[in-house]
């Protein structure tokens, strides 16, 4: 394989040697923007912009600057969480510290993210796949030498080294050695909770899926119908999620050099069901540059609008997602939750009224044990309240989790009729209460309840009275649990919903003054995506507010005020952390105490979580330190200066830039 890829690269070099890039004319813009990387072998790399419906007209062409000497840009993609363009630089001739993650501005300026890493991607820089997994905010990197990595877009480091790319044992092409050079995920939008990874096996001109992605298992979809395996060809794949239609559309760029040193750059659409490629137009008008990589833009607002209604926190996959109660289609943020026991799944989420902090319940259904966590709403970091999981027989079904505001205890109920109280201070079981049972004489007295959600009224620290409402998923009815400790259920009415088999249903009640507003989230749609509803606690009737995001399966919610929760943060590693001046005009100084010698970096992000700058302060000695950031050229607004010691979060300060 090594000899083949080296030969392929040499052929590509020979075909383009001596060619210079031409200036490209601009054209009219249209709905969906895409980006590409073009290059010649004189070392000129350019970022081009075009519309998918008019690929022949590049609306912008700018040189790429800032790449480390010896590296080539081998991949670009848009980060779904922020809409930022990222790029991977790779030096095929180096064996260590040969790769660097960058953000790529539309001006063509590359900004390093973290430090260089070592990626064994082989010697063929034309066969490297690079794409964001939208469900976990990690970057998949694949290569023609069967390499399979994940990168962290926050630190630039290697998140995991995964299994080599190999066809599944039962696949019709199981005996073949793949030559993957392009990768792309479906459902590329913030808040995505389901995705599929597709690759182009360029060695055999076919579309494949990579399932499971981390195992590197390839599954044949079908032939492209066009060749991608010539030594004089370079292909790339990206998949655009259309928020209007709710559909995924796959695009492939294919650059082919001729023996006469002219280049044909073609855009194709790809049928994800069959693999068939259909020509969609020429890419640009130049015939002496090659189109290396393709990335469809993902639109995120330049600044988020004011919250409408309340701020809702939701558990979607392994992420903490936030959205507005009056506008759930706008996902404000999605952060990965870290620090949870690997044997547990988060099954409950609520705001503790006494502290305005976010709490969650981690549960191991096999061991029937649980841990109470606090969740940092800004970073997703979970901190265990009880160091050792407690025995909690909640079965294998759905679980309800909510704070009783009058006694500062957590009510935990299960579809198996379990009924517990937990102490939020130490995570212990405060009481094992009566099994959930419909009251004698109730309309459902003959039925066995299957409760999967619970919520108390008057969720404020000063509450002296409250009521507990629960949701029976088997009958889709709302019930009052009264008395709560006896587990007696009293039917109030049907919701008119039918949850899917996954039964991702939860409810929460927000209190403002003397008014309680109940919300319910359910995946009643046939596609499994969740919808937010308001809930009438008198009769169980639901009124849809809207679909959450572009389509997310949300299993738990917690409703907070518009300002959000206070959060429970880990102690900062940096002592005496301070920012001055603030507001900032020009140079901002961050002073802190360093407890031990460490490499210090500072990442600057905007209000949308986009990385706008990285300051590498180098190795610093223990003691007082200062790191400076120049805000010149940054738009006025809110920024977050995030310190890291030896790549570990050390503290954050918020800055307001005035110009």
PLM region spans:
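Structural motif
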Residues: 42-49, 94-103, 147-151, 205-211, ...
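Beta-propeller fold detector
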Residues: 58-68, 108-119, 158-171, 209-227, ...
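Short, glycine-anchored, charge-dense loop/turn motifs used at functional sites
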Residues: 604-612, 639
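Residue-level detector of functionally pivotal "anchor" positions at catalytic/ligand-binding pockets or at interdomain
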Residues: 562-580, 593-595, 612
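Short coil/turn segments that connect the beta-strands within blades of beta-propeller domains
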Residues: 32, 83, 135-137, 194-195, ...
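Repeated scaffold domains used in trafficking and secretory/extracellular systems
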Residues: 69-77, 118-132, 168-188, 229-239, ...
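C-terminal tail/sorting-segment detector
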Residues: 614, 627-628, 633-659
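Sec/Tat signal peptide C-region and signal peptidase I cleavage site
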Residues: 26-31
């Amino acid at each position: 394989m090594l000899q083949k890829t080296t030969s392929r690269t040499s052929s590509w070099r020979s075909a383009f040697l001596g060619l210079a890039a031409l200036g490209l004319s601009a054209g009219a813009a249209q709905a969906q923007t895409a980006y590409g990387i073009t290059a010649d072998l004189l070392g000129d790399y350019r970022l081009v912009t075009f519309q998918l419906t008019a690929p022949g007209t590049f609306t912008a062409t700018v040189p790429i600057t800032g790449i480390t000497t010896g590296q080539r840009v081998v991949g670009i993609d848009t980060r779904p969480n922020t809409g930022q363009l990222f790029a991977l630089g790779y030096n095929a001739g180096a064996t260590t510290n040969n790769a660097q993650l960058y953000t790529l501005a539309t001006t063509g300026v590359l900004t390093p993210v973290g430090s260089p890493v070592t990626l064994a991607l082989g010697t063929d820089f034309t066969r490297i796949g690079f794409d964001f997994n939208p469900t976990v905010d990690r970057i998949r990197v694949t290569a023609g030498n069967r390499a399979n990595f994940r990168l962290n877009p926050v630190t630039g480091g290697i998140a995991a080294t995964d299994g080599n790319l190999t066809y599944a044992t039962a696949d019709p092409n199981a005996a073949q050695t793949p030559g993957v050079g392009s990768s792309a995920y479906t459902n590329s939008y913030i808040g995505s909770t389901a995705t599929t990874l597709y690759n182009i096996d360029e060695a055999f001109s076919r579309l494949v899926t990579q399932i499971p992605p981390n195992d590197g298992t390839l599954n044949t979809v079908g032939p492209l119908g066009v060749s991608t395996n010539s030594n004089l060809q370079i292909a790339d794949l990206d998949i655009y999620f259309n928020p209007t239609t709710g559909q995924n559309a796959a695009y492939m760029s294919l650059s082919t050099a001729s023996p006469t040193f002219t280049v044909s750059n073609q855009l194709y659409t790809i049928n994800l069901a069959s693999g068939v490629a259909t020509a969609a137009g020429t890419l640009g008008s130049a015939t002496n540059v090659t189109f290396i990589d393709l990335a469809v833009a993902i639109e995120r607002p330049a600044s988020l609008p004011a919250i409408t209604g309340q701020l809702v926190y939701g558990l979607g996959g392994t992420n903490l997602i936030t959205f507005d109660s009056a506008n759930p289609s706008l996902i404000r943020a999605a952060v990965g939750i870290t620090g949870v026991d690997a044997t547990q799944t988060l099954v409950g989420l609520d705001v503790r009224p006494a502290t305005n902090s976010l709490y969650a319940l981690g549960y191991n259904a096999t061991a029937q044990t649980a841990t109470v966590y606090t969740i940092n709403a800004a970073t997703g970091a979970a901190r265990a309240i009880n160091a050792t999981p407690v025995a909690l027989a909640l079965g294998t079904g759905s679980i309800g989790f909510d704070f009783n505001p009058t006694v500062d205890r957590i009510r935990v109920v299960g579809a198996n009729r379990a009924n517990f109280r937990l102490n939020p201070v130490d995570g212990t079981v405060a009481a094992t209460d009566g099994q959930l049972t419909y009251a004698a004489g109730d309309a459902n007295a003959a039925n066995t309840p299957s409760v999967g959600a619970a919520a108390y009224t008057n969720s404020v620290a000063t509450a002296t009275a409250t009521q507990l409402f629960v949701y029976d998923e088997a009958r889709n009815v709302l019930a009052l649990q009264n008395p709560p400790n006896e587990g007696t259920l009293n039917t109030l009415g049907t919701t008119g919903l039918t949850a899917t088999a996954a039964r991702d249903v939860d409810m929460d009640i927000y209190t403002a003054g003397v008014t309680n507003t109940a919300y319910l989230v359910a995946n009643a749609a046939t596609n499994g995506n969740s919808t937010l509803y308001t809930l009438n606690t008198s009769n169980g009737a639901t009124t849809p507010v809207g679909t959450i995001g572009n389509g997310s399966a949300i299993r738990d919610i917690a409703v907070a005020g518009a300002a959000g929760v206070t959060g429970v943060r880990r102690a900062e590693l940096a002592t005496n952390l301070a920012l001055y001046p603030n507001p900032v005009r020009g140079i901002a100084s961050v002073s802190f105490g360093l407890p031990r010698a460490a490499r210090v970096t500072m990442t600057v992000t905007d209000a949308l979580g986009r990385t706008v700058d990285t300051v590498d302060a180098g190795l610093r000695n223990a003691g007082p330190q200062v790191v400076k950031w120049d805000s010149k050229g940054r738009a006025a607004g809110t920024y977050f200066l995030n310190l890291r010691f030896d790549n570990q979060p050390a503290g954050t300060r918020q800055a307001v830039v005035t110009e």
